[in-house]
Amino acid sequence: MIRPNTTILPVNTTGKTAHSTDDRPDAAVLLPSVGLLALDRQYAVLREEIRIAIERVCDSGRFILGPDVNELESELARVLGVPHALSCASGSDALLLALMALDIHPGDEVILPSYTFFATASAVTRLGAVPIFADIDPLTFLIDPADVERKLSKRSKAIIPVHLFGRTANMDALLLIAKAAGVPIVEDAAQSILSTWNGKCSGSLGDVGCFSFYPTKNLGGIGDGGFLTTTRDDIAKSLKLLRVHGMEPRYYHQVVGINSRLDSIQAAVLRVKLPHLDSWTTARQSNAARYMELFSQYDLEQHVTVPGDESHGRHVWNQFVIRVADGQRDALRAHLTTCNVGTEIYYPVPLHLQKCFESLGWQKGDLPETERAAEETLALPIFPELTPAEQRTVVGRIAEFFRVPQARQATDASTHPQAAAETLDGPHFLRRIKAVGCADDVRC
């Protein structure tokens, strides 16, 4: 009987199955399949609670901005330590609404990283403003405050740091720069819910925080959704008006807004998930620490650079992104695909080199660290339900690609349970969690 999540590789023309160590001509290898994501595992645990929540909304007939939306907003504000949390239709809309609330006009400049998802820049250009791209810190992949300062001008009207992959940007430096220049900060926290900087949650540090409920996020819905946070009453009032066509009261429009409301069914499902977010985050942190341990055990440091340990807070690991130097990233990814290991490249083409921004005049070489990251980075599976065995498979396949000998310490619990407990689940492993800066006493 074939185990679930396995794939039989066909025999190739040389008479050996791909990646087989068996020289028999008819040998076939069963390779475990490790997906980049496994949303079905999360759903399976919560299936009944989600069903009840959806039926409650359907029975109420309140499908738009219903009671569950109000409750979710209150719960998010409490969890993140902010006075205001306002939901909307997507993380992309959250960015657009934030800039609208800050009264960004055509011709204004907004400084942001080029190494980010497209929505960060598209929100700027939709308002006729100009994205000014800053380079990144090569250790963290986050916007470089020094380059932000260099890019400031009299036309600068906002700064958007992106808390990429689950790590908060250097907000101390950015806040000082923004204050001196008199410009607001919009935090793109789409990938970083519950991450912290010096004890404060992402989304609570700048003027506005923007989050996404896209299903692959750490707190994901069953479709699109997003929300914004702010400590400023005036911005909260504007956001609440802008998301409903600027309408207050009904059919009386004070400003030209957009239609960006969170469905009640999405809110109901997210309320089921929110109490689990902290434990899911802890699981992601444990998985990150285990990867660190495994890469060390396989002596892969000369081939692969794992995420840096520098942190001033809680890293929530929306993605685990490694660097693969010497032009081998794409070949490694192809190898892992053949081995049924899911990966992704975030992001293969920096925004300043995208075709749609050609008119801005950016050239290759303008942002060297951003461009190097786009050529070298590869995301590995990091979802909360990922098992230690699956992680050993992932790192083992990477070691296979680089022809690295077997790991120094046995980590297969099925054959060496005591060694596995000592190396991955024992005190040394727990120390590794602290070492990567992702287990602290902060619970926001």
Spans of features found by a protein language model:
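Conserved active-site segment immediately N-terminal to the catalytic lysine
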Residues: E187-I222, P249-Q254
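N-terminal "arm"/small-domain region of PLP-dependent enzymes with the aminotransferase-like
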Residues: I2-R62, V442-C444
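Hydrophobic/aromatic ligand-binding patch that stacks against planar heteroaromatic rings
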Residues: A123-V124, I177, C201, N218, ...
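Phosphate-binding glycine-rich loop
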Residues: S60-E109, A123-L127, I132-D135, K200
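PLP-dependent aminotransferase class I/II
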Residues: T21-A28, D40, I52, V69-S74, ...
